[in-house]
């Protein structure tokens, strides 16, 4: 018989995930259907979102050549029935206080930075780049993880060296870019561009660097269609940029610079977001989401 969720002690809540303690070495990481945008957790939820994030992470944890924090399969008997398919048993790590971002294309905050300074996170770039320009080689741009509700802070590589040492900083940079390139090459073969993504790493009890949290989910990555890709224009996305775009549109009536929280999402935006997440999972993994374990929406 599987344990109940209340058999485990709740440790922490994030924007999307809940963390529970299983034992001294293992945690239960549960992905909810919550969605965040512009540092707000929205009132609306996206049906099946937590299961899709978990399915995508499981696929890429097994695909990329990097040790990770998984400590059991997605049907591990330690996972309670009520969260099956949206929860993973993971090793407890000493998490590093930064996100490791790989950028293959100029977009988002990187584009704004470039337009203002000619650089992205302090890295000089050639003139004449525009929205969705592809970099000659992907950029590594670390960021300090902010507390819930605040913005992450981009930091220079030299600052990262001061924080973790030159050996660990080089290891984080090299592993981030290696993982990104491996996954981006696979995604291109399925008609998907991974424009950018972010990773988190932690250290285990033996001092090993492990990939942790989530990887290549539509929450942590920008996904574009190869067929629709055009330099100089905003791309069609298969990620939560779809939600961000609606929130800043006149249709939402929300003023980002104002004091009010974002409005609830209309039903058509909720369903379209779910379909985007499902589509990118199925195209990249080659599997049907209908076959993923756990109770669906």
From Swiss-Prot:
Gene Ontology, cellular component aspect: cytoplasm
Signal sequence residues: none
Tell me which UniProt keywords the record has, alphabetically.
Answer: ATP-binding, Ligase, Nucleotide-binding, Purine biosynthesis
User: EC number(s) of the enzyme?
Assistant: 6.3.2.6
**GO process annotations (BP):** 'de novo' IMP biosynthetic process
Record PROSITE patterns: SAICAR_SYNTHETASE_1, SAICAR_SYNTHETASE_2
Q: Does the keyword ATP-binding apply?
A: yes
Q: Which pathway is this protein assigned to?
A: Purine metabolism; IMP biosynthesis via de novo pathway; 5-amino-1-(5-phospho-D-ribosyl)imidazole-4-carboxamide from 5-amino-1-(5-phospho-D-ribosyl)imidazole-4-carboxylate: step 1/2
Pfam families reported in the protein's UniProt record:
SAICAR_synt (PF01259)
Q: Which CDD domains match?
A: SAICAR_synt_Sc
As for family, the record states: Belongs to the SAICAR synthetase family.
Write the protein's name: Phosphoribosylaminoimidazole-succinocarboxamide synthase
The major lineage groups are:
Bacteria, Bacillati, Actinomycetota, Actinomycetes, Mycobacteriales
Q: Which gene underlies this protein?
A: purC
